[in-house]
Amino acid sequence: YVKQEDMLPLFNRFYGAAKDYTFVILGDCTIQDIKPLITTYIGGLPKGSNDTDWCYTERNIPYKSCSLIRHTGDSPKASVSLIFQQDSLLEEFSSFTLKSNVMKAMLRTCLLNRLREEMGKVYSVSVAASAGLYPSFLSRTMIGFVCLPEDVDSLVNATQEELQRLYEYPESFDGILTDVKRNLLKDFELDKQKNSFWTSWIRNSIFNQQEDWKYLNNYAQTVNSITAK
């Protein structure tokens, strides 16, 4: 483990020098006005090289179903997490990420309807989807809810049934998909007004080596082209 007094020296060892970093700067100004400030800032950063020779190159993930059950006291509630992951990327990463976000929103709507409205056994359902290209591709979808311990099996079975139904009869979810796409486009119109959106987008595009700048220009068209199938 890492001791507290070792954390800052380790950080400086790995990330202290500015060499080979890419800086993303946004501002309502001209390059002529801000260039002296950028030069002064970067020129004042520590020089030298970072110690990054060691790289973690692979992920060891299980390829079969497994369960982890832990009893933590006498609480009358059970916290359930279903995790699905894969390591095969069959399309462009940006397209995969967008479709994952669509799937996440659709799945949450379906599970809320089934587990809360129909079964009445949960207050809410969380669905999260994430993916990364490095050190090797891995995507993960997580479904979570809190329920009575005696309801765990029936809720897990119902969740799996909804996943199977979404896979076998995608056209029956067209109404939900339409709402999801409409909300994505609304969110995009708001997000693109924020500097934080652009800095994160540029940073992630450079880091992932996915510098397709036309993607944002064609975002609405791409979203509208997604079908349930």
Give residue spans per PLM region:
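His/Glu-based metal-binding/catalytic segments typifying zinc-dependent metallopeptidases
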Residues: N50-C110, R114, G144
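Charge-rich, well-structured scaffold segments of protease-associated domains
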Residues: Y1-T52, M119, S124-K229
